[in-house]
Amino acid sequence: MPALLDKLLRAGEGKILRKLKAIAEQVNSIEDEFAKLSDGELRGLTDEFRARYADGESLDDLLPEAFAAVREAAKRTLGQRHFDVQIMGGAALHFGNIAEMKTGEGKTLVSTLPAYLNALAGRGVHVVTVNDYLARRDAEWMGRIHRFLGLEVGVISPQMGPAERKKAYAADITYGTNNEFGFDYLRDNMAWSVDEIVQRGHFYAIVDEVDSILIDEARTPLIISGPVDMNQKWYTDFAKLAERLQRGENGEGDYEVDEKKRTISITERGVQRVEDWLGIDNLYEPTNTPLVGYLHNALRAKELYKRDRDYVVIDGEVLIVDEFTGRILYGRRYNEGMHQAIEAKEGVPIKQENQTLATITLQNYFRLYEKLAGMTGTAMTEANEFHQIYKLGVVPIPTNRPMIRIDQPDVVFKTEKAKFAAVVEDIAQRHAKGQPVLVGTTSVEKSELLSGMLLRRGIPHAVLNAKYHEKEAAIVAQAGRKGAVTVATNMAGRGTDIMLGGNPEFLARQELAERGLSPVDTPEEYEAAWPEVLEKWKKAVAAEHDEVVQLGGLYVLGTERHDSRRIDNQLRGRSGRQGDPGESRFYLSLEDDLMRLFNGPMVQRIMETLNYPEDVPLESKMVTRAIRSAQTQVEQQNFEIRKNVLKYDEVLNKQRAVIYAERRRVLHGDDLHEQVGHMIDDVIRDYVRAATEEGYAEDWDLEQLWTALRSLYPVGLTIDQVVAECGGDRSGLTAEFLIERLTEDAHRAYAEREAALGTLPDGQPVIRELERRVVLAVLDRKWREHLYEMDYLQEGIQLRSYGQRDPLVEYQREGYTMFQTMLDGIKEESVRLLFSVDVQVTPVAEAPVAATAAADGAGTAAEGTAGVAVPQPAGASGPALQPVPAATAPGQQPVPAAAALSPGAGMRLADSPVAKLLAPPRPTRLQYTAPTIDGAAGSGEATAMTVDERRPSGAAARGPSPASASRQRAGAGEQARPLMYAGTPRSAKCPCGSGKPYKRCHGDPRNAG
């Protein structure tokens, strides 16, 4: 079926390309006309286009003229003219497609065309890049075109506060990374005032390196989490225990490792050893569940997470490495205890665990946009997935000049040692004649191994990996110069062209930056100096370019095949840009991960049969086909996992949409009085039905019902009064009558409550403001608890398959039930708090507004004379509510909030446990975790920013999620403490002197410590 769909998708390519070519011809036909316009006239076209759009013309109608204007502006600002194929690519993006354009074809310049056109609608365009460097670079570089045409350009960076972010999103075109856009969406839906909301909608997005972002990063979600209590000693203890346990196969040893699935299974022997070490009878008792999580994480840290491949240790800190790009992911941590397990393994300080507060997958975030488009050099291999999940077509755009790169067959050696020896020899020969060489490795460890071998041969080279990524743009820009040898961990997403002889544009920008000139800070001086500096560097590299062409162009040498064909193609694609010559080859060994895990035995049998020496390579198309088959298997497996993730996340996505829409309504100051009235009706109805659903009327426990109702509101009716109204006999009561009378009584009490609270000096009823505060606080807390419960449900749902039940159907059914329960809980708690919180109108001293630091959630709430201010939602005029003291209710996870204090009189909540429930969450440093490229196409699991437990595919050995771990800790009391007297036999008396057996005293994790 996928093959048939691929054929159908390709069948329409010719028709689409003919349409795009016709558009390019339209743009060409008016090019001379636009060239005659003055700068002012060209800039004035933007206002004209906007007016025509407002008068009813569509963006499609404006496309040829808008594209012609951008092409002319690019010539005048950058000295670059959009080729016809770039016009075609821009049109493909405007129509909501993915444009596949080979490396060096100018994708960045292409994006300016649809970005400008869609910005004319006035609703904002988001240009999404894979890293902050590219976002800043493109906002400055391509932003020159847009600013010349009168548009505002913004850029989002992690260091920005809310005000700066809001300004950036208000611009016509906003550049940023996928993670920043996604986190801003989540933060906006955690805001306590409209002023904190920074995004203004999701109209149109252009995603650069779209395959990396929408495919590779799609399996793991963006997560904002907050710290929870944990016992660090367990991580250290289990790290030591993991070192003692022995790996085995076929039931031997203490545990087994499946490297393909990246799972670990504990054997019976291993379980017995762990139980003996811990001094417990049954490791899998419910009270010991957290211990199982610690054990699994410790073993995964030992076997599956390798230093200098998956992470590096710098200055006593474990830093994650992006497998595909080789970059260090600063500030990112594995979730669910995995990062702490690695820290314990490495013997560095262990940092706190986190609990999920808000989450969304990139799949669902980008589906929020009304129109989505993307660019990449490698999309056709995933065309089926783009179509099925995102409804995006893939349009392969022709190259401006024919591709003449020579892709040599793979060569395979028996050992890694022999492979690297051959690699160094090949590099030495190419370097000796002056041909530039780009070497791709799959890990920091391998790049440094190769670097050491090159140093011993006396070959000068540059290393581009996670440890030196600050220099990466400069290194890549020079990788095409004569005699250059560049060793790169991976080339995916580098974003800088490798031009033969050197990159004149990069060198020109670098020189202007050294002079202190910037297109943003000093635009006039920058624009004046640019043409001369660019021309100087073009001349400087022209002669060297011709010389390198004669030497054969850039030689790309891959030292290992990746799980994904796209990553291999991205590495190869660095050579042969814009019709330049080039060559590529991959060197492999039977010890490489892909060969070892998939087709290694077959290839080894061939080599042994042919009696191949260790240092003689096997160069065969059959081997190449076997490797391609292995890669296809991995890609299909990962596609199925991503589809499965989407099915599960769709359940939470619908719930998220309901909650976030309601939250926005509250924040924007809608009158909640009618809604609160419905809440009262629903809660009273639920209380009565629960008390009357069984037995006859005379058997109903009305006393218990009245006791429950008194905890909800001040009941004015007595049981005798209600019975008297029914003729004096309880048998005459009906549930409907009780609901009617008690609802009337509750509304009477609420009206009295409103009158008693009175009004603020501006005339607004106090109860209206209180309603907003209460509903917002309760909704946030209940939603966080629901996320935590849904996470726990998803973690164990795969076990339902053993009972012949579809786990997805079960998850949908139970998730819906839990969501309805949460909504009922929001109503009940809101009503209870509205009746019970003690509010007083008191003078409040003027205090400054304190805003949350959006980047890290580390803002500080402002304090007035009456305590810490409750953030004031929009639409709420007048003074602020103030709880005293500002404390977080037990079990309530703090989230960042801005404090909006108004001078003059205000409302103050009397000191009580109820008031604490309405206290604004204390600003705290939050953890932002996000997927990286190895989330899908790489390891076959979502290892980058959140651990496997978040995906529903099930595994043999996985630790608890943040939510479940927190709940298990809460349920098990103090079990998670290091065992005292750990060497004591389990049946012996405990050394503490209690007289109890050790296993029932300090040998029990619940009593340990």
From Swiss-Prot:
Provide the cofactor list for this protein: Zn(2+)
Coiled-coil annotation reads none
**What's a Pfam family in this record?**
P-loop_SecA
User: What does the record's cofactor remark say about binding?
Assistant: May bind 1 zinc ion per subunit.
Compositional bias of type Low complexity: which residue ranges? 883-894, 953-973
Q: How does it sit in the membrane?
A: Peripheral membrane protein
Annotated region Disordered: the residues are 869-894, 949-1009
What are the binding positions for Zn(2+) in this chain?
Answer: C990, C992, C1001, H1002
Q: List the record's Gene Ontology CC terms alphabetically.
A: cell envelope Sec protein transport complex; cytosol; plasma membrane
Q: What class of enzyme is it?
A: translocase
* Reaction(s) this enzyme catalyzes, per UniProt: ATP + H2O + cellular proteinSide 1 = ADP + phosphate + cellular proteinSide 2
Q: Which GO terms describe its biological process?
A: intracellular protein transmembrane transport; protein import; protein targeting; protein transport by the Sec complex
Gene Ontology MF term list: ATP binding; metal ion binding; protein-exporting ATPase activity
- What Gene3D superfamilies does the record tag this protein with? Helical scaffold and wing domains of SecA, P-loop containing nucleotide triphosphate hydrolases, SecA, preprotein cross-linking domain
Self-association or partners: how does it assemble?
Monomer and homodimer. Part of the essential Sec protein translocation apparatus which comprises SecA, SecYEG and auxiliary proteins SecDF. Other proteins may also be involved.
Annotated protein name in UniProt: Protein translocase subunit SecA
Which organism's genome codes for this protein? Acidothermus cellulolyticus (strain ATCC 43068 / DSM 8971 / 11B)
